[in-house]
Design a protein with these regions (language model features):
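Compositional signal for N-terminal targeting/processing segments
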Residues: 1-124
């Protein structure tokens, strides 16, 4: 993503919350990501998350549908979960940067982030 941005002379920013700014708050809520992953593994009869990932996304014949398949996968994986305290903190930080960038550009911006964060950021 950085190389492509450089080629088209796009401005780039790292928008994740720096480690030094993260609170040490511990969230003891169940790990929704692990629960969702276990459900997907059972539903697809796959042995582990690597096998599932290869089956869903590494087959070159599926490359044209990859963006929508990834969006669907992470939306299902995340569900309605707000995430743990650290992810909520990180996503709030990212959302502020995204809002700032949209104001600077009078519109759309491209965000490259982990798939777990994409559904939450799209709602903010």
């Amino acid at each position: 993503a950085l190389q492509a941005a450089r080629r088209i002379q796009a401005q780039t920013y790292f928008i994740d919350l720096p480690c030094w700014a993260q609170s040490e708050e511990v969230d003891d809520s169940p790990d929704t990501q692990e629960e969702s992953q276990a459900l997907l593994l059972r539903a697809t009869r796959m042995d582990n998350s690597d096998t599932l990932w290869d089956h869903l996304f590494e087959d070159e014949s599926q490359q044209t549908a990859l963006p929508s398949a990834l969006a669907h996968y992470f939306a299902q994986l995340r569900g309605d979960s707000p995430g743990d305290a650290l992810n909520r903190q990180r996503e709030a930080f990212m959302a502020r940067w995204i809002g700032w960038a949209m104001q600077q550009n009078n519109g759309d911006v491209l965000v490259v982030c982990g798939g777990w964060h994409a559904p939450a950021l799209a709602k903010m």
